Each structure stands twice: as structure tokens, then as C-alpha cells.
């Protein structure tokens, strides 16, 4: 597994930790703010960028804590990082993007992106070896394709 992938894995996990600590008070008087597509993309890309950075940090910490040689990790070590760091982190990113609320008229597209990301994250947790396979489509291909078509610049990048 490359350092970049491990880094990406670590960043997603860190987002999950940070987001879990964030709460909001809801007194029932708040009104929902509907983002424009441009605002949605900007905020979504910020979530993905921060997530990638945190995935990198978390993957590096995980590798250090478990004495994983990031230059020559075994397949089992790679799978452990993918299922333990990347999958949960990507699920958290999906949750955060979903929480932004879809721009008017873009509900189906944004729901499809989130659903594809959730599906990919679940597959990575359940069968991390799919990310390491060099043939066929990967568990994140659909989410990446949909995110790119929607206009994301950070989300949907490998």
C-alpha cells in the first residue's frame, strides 16, 4: 500500500473522531439553510480535503502503533488499515456530506453520491481486499465517478 493511500485512510478516520465530538444544540427554532450547488460542492470538498489529511495522519499513526513498514506492508496489514481506518472514515465523510442537505433540484444526484460512498465504505470494511485488486471496478469507483460528474474537485479523487 502506498504512503498516499495509507495517508488517505488516516485522514478519513480522523474526520470521524472530530465529527463524533461535535454536537449541535437544537431548540427547534432553527430553519434549514439550503445551499446552492456551488456552496454544496465547496463545503463537500472541504469535508473531503480535511478527511484526506486526517486519513493520512490516522493511517500513519495506525502504522506506527502496529509496527507496519509503510514501504513494504503485507497484504494483511494493508487490509487492516483499509477496514479499520479507511472504511469508517469514508462512512463519516458520507454522513457529513449528507448532513449538508442537497441543493434544490439536486437531491437525487447528491443522494446517489452519498449512497455510493456509503456502499463503498461498507464494502471496504467488510472486504478490504477489494481495494487491492488490480482488475475490475473498485468499491469506490461509482462514488468517485458520480462526485466528479457533479463537480467536486476534492471528493471523488483517488
Regions found by a protein language model. Name each.
Residues 23-26:
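Bacterial signal peptide processing site
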Residues 10-11, 116:
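Enrichment for repetitive, rod-forming helical segments
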Residues 1-10:
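Bacterial N-terminal signal peptides that target proteins for export
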Residues 29-33:
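Extracellular mucin-like PTS domains
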Residues 12-16:
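Alpha-helical transmembrane segments
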Residues 18-21:
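C-terminal motif of bacterial Sec signal peptides marking the signal peptidase cleavage site
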Residues 36-125, 133-157:
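Alpha-helical segments in soluble extracytoplasmic regions
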